[in-house]
Amino acid sequence: MSRIKIFDTTLRDGEQSPGVNLNKAEKLEIAKQLEKYGVDRMEAGFPASSKGDFESVKQIAETIKSSSVIALARAVKSDIDIAYEALKGAEKPAIHIFLATSPIHMTYKLKKSPEQVIETAVNMVTYAKERFDEIEWSAEDATRSDWNFLAQIIEKVIEAGATVINLPDTVGYTTPEEYGKLFRFIKETVPNINQVALSCHCHNDLGMAVANSIAAVENGATQVEGTINGIGERAGNAALEEVAVALKIRSDYYPFETGLILKETKRTSDLVAKLTGMYVQANKAVIGRNAFSHESGIHQDGVLKNTETYEIITPEMVGVSSNTLFLGKHSGRHAFKDKLKEFGVELSEEELKTAFEQFKLLTDQKKEVTDDDLYTILMDIKTDSTVVDKYKLIQFGVSYDTAATPKANVILESPNGSLIEATQQGNGSVEALYKTINYLIAENITLVDYQINSVGGGKDALAESHVQIIINGETINGRGSAQDVLQASAVAFIQAVNRYYVQKKANLTRLVYES
């Protein structure tokens, strides 16, 4: 079996999804889980785009040991220098340099001739080679580029020191047969291609990102790039968990394997969904909640007799298990700490104290506390940002009557420590609550999206709310959890506002580039 390397770009390409704005702590938690998942390489960010991205890449580089940590850079010396500084503490640093090669990009974006593009690519790879042993070079918009020109520029950048060549389908334009032919052409045409690894990077605009990735592997690609849950700009990227499971399940047909630890799939997927606010659709392949459900009576009968009649993927393979009671209201601190070790989450003494207190409060309200409940508490604590003073929810009440307009009263602690209170009406309980919070905060806020989900099951399940707001022109996501739906909704809205102030203080302006 040939080994296919997995290049995860959830923290870079995935974070370019509209409204996704992970803080430094959230990015680090995702990076640590990606390492547990077994990704070979993770693209931690684009350090030249902002101070925040630089600091995040630097922290991840200093933390991750087994996976290679990669920084994105344009074909510009200053970007390469900044990437080098961000990755100084990495065990396995690498740089990813991209430059457009399609006629439309060279003419209208770069305003360079093909000869000038080759010269720039060679010069920047040569410059990067003085700082990095591992260099990935991407031909942006490769699938709309002239194939002969691609072969020419690839040969030159390999001579300059590139170690990985990436042929991205930047706009999700290609098809499996066509993409496979491109890889075969490059393998057969570029004389020094065997000196490097060949990588694919597919977007999902036509719904073929995973199929295109597998077609590339069949035709010489030794690395697949993508994201967890397939998140990303526009229609997203190739879902890495789908690629890995497809190769595993169809190992009878595909002589390839990855190094992913598939039983970590569910945990990884859930974490990314929770922190980005991009929930996994119920019928998503491999990891959707309906992936192992059977509605048809014929199907149910078959599965009961032999699961292999209709299930080609077992829940256990991807880490799906039933939630069970693990701790109760009489559980002590020692038992609680033992349970945390199973999650592999490290807490400071202060964080442990906070987590245990929240757990005890939850056991007063819930008869059964599940792994999902506890993991939600832990992630809320681990990913909290304390960069600036914030608004805090002190108290709220909502009055609802079918014969009257809902009314909400809210008391907040403002960033300066003073208590502020207001009452507003709305067409529903949530609207009344949000109108009151908005009135107290006194910013130009528009609610774009609101979601509420249960964590685990049962009538006393923990509620988790995700909101997306536009505040003074900035799109921000927020997340909140509580046993009460309205409390979770209020916490999510306030968290989104606080994130806006964190970003505003840090003055994080981001440059977004596709590859």
UniProtKB/Swiss-Prot annotation:
<dbReference type="GO" id="GO:0003852">
    <property type="term" value="F:2-isopropylmalate synthase activity"/>
</dbReference>
<protein>
    <recommendedName>
        <fullName>2-isopropylmalate synthase</fullName>
        <ecNumber>2.3.3.13</ecNumber>
    </recommendedName>
</protein>
<dbReference type="InterPro" id="IPR050073">
    <property type="entry name" value="2-IPM_HCS-like"/>
</dbReference>
<dbReference type="InterPro" id="IPR036230">
    <property type="entry name" value="LeuA_allosteric_dom_sf"/>
</dbReference>
<dbReference type="GO" id="GO:0005737">
    <property type="term" value="C:cytoplasm"/>
</dbReference>
<comment type="function">
    <text>Catalyzes the condensation of the acetyl group of acetyl-CoA with 3-methyl-2-oxobutanoate (2-ketoisovalerate) to form 3-carboxy-3-hydroxy-4-methylpentanoate (2-isopropylmalate).</text>
</comment>
<comment type="similarity">
    <text>Belongs to the alpha-IPM synthase/homocitrate synthase family. LeuA type 1 subfamily.</text>
</comment>
<dbReference type="InterPro" id="IPR002034">
    <property type="entry name" value="AIPM/Hcit_synth_CS"/>
</dbReference>
<feature type="binding site">
    <location>
        <position position="201"/>
    </location>
    <ligand>
        <name>Mn(2+)</name>
    </ligand>
</feature>
<feature type="binding site">
    <location>
        <position position="203"/>
    </location>
    <ligand>
        <name>Mn(2+)</name>
    </ligand>
</feature>
<dbReference type="GO" id="GO:0003985">
    <property type="term" value="F:acetyl-CoA C-acetyltransferase activity"/>
</dbReference>
<dbReference type="InterPro" id="IPR013785">
    <property type="entry name" value="Aldolase_TIM"/>
</dbReference>
<comment type="pathway">
    <text>Amino-acid biosynthesis; L-leucine biosynthesis; L-leucine from 3-methyl-2-oxobutanoate: step 1/4.</text>
</comment>
<keyword id="KW-0963">Cytoplasm</keyword>
<keyword id="KW-0100">Branched-chain amino acid biosynthesis</keyword>
<dbReference type="Pfam" id="PF08502">
    <property type="entry name" value="LeuA_dimer"/>
</dbReference>
<dbReference type="GO" id="GO:0009098">
    <property type="term" value="P:L-leucine biosynthetic process"/>
</dbReference>
<dbReference type="Pfam" id="PF00682">
    <property type="entry name" value="HMGL-like"/>
</dbReference>
<dbReference type="InterPro" id="IPR005671">
    <property type="entry name" value="LeuA_bact_synth"/>
</dbReference>
<feature type="domain" description="Pyruvate carboxyltransferase">
    <location>
        <begin position="4"/>
        <end position="266"/>
    </location>
</feature>
<feature type="region of interest" description="Regulatory domain">
    <location>
        <begin position="392"/>
        <end position="515"/>
    </location>
</feature>
<keyword id="KW-0464">Manganese</keyword>
<dbReference type="InterPro" id="IPR000891">
    <property type="entry name" value="PYR_CT"/>
</dbReference>
<dbReference type="GO" id="GO:0030145">
    <property type="term" value="F:manganese ion binding"/>
</dbReference>
<dbReference type="InterPro" id="IPR054691">
    <property type="entry name" value="LeuA/HCS_post-cat"/>
</dbReference>
<keyword id="KW-0808">Transferase</keyword>
<comment type="subunit">
    <text>Homodimer.</text>
</comment>
<keyword id="KW-0432">Leucine biosynthesis</keyword>
<dbReference type="Pfam" id="PF22617">
    <property type="entry name" value="HCS_D2"/>
</dbReference>
<keyword id="KW-0479">Metal-binding</keyword>
<dbReference type="InterPro" id="IPR013709">
    <property type="entry name" value="2-isopropylmalate_synth_dimer"/>
</dbReference>
<feature type="binding site">
    <location>
        <position position="237"/>
    </location>
    <ligand>
        <name>Mn(2+)</name>
    </ligand>
</feature>
<keyword id="KW-0028">Amino-acid biosynthesis</keyword>
<feature type="binding site">
    <location>
        <position position="13"/>
    </location>
    <ligand>
        <name>Mn(2+)</name>
    </ligand>
</feature>
